[in-house]
Structures are given as structure tokens and as C-alpha cells.
């Protein structure tokens, strides 16, 4: 499931829904939107970081990076 969420968020970054260097929805927002646990949302965000789609800033949030 986390891979599907990561693909959905990556698609939003790619199509400009989440512009580069802009804050993206929180893990809590992802949990609510997709009906998943916090652990699943964290796994999706970790995959997005690994793939270069987002960057995380502790205490500030997660930001879109654009197409990796």
C-alpha cells in the first residue's frame, strides 16, 4: 500500500500539484486521505525521499523536490 501512496504523491509532484520547494501534506493528512496508519504514511514518505521526490526537514515538514 505504501508504494501506491508514494506513486500517487510522486505523480502530484510531477504534475505540479505540489510545486518544487513547497510544503506537501503531512503524514497525518496522508493517513486521513488514504485511510492508512501512520506507519504506512511514514513508509511512503521514506520511499519518496529515497527516490528523490521529496526532502524532509525535521520540525518543519516535507517539501517537494521536483522530478528526480
Task: Describe the function of each predicted region.
Residues 1-36, 42-55, 60, 66-68:
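Extreme N-terminal segment that seeds HTH/winged-HTH DNA-binding domains in transcriptional regulators
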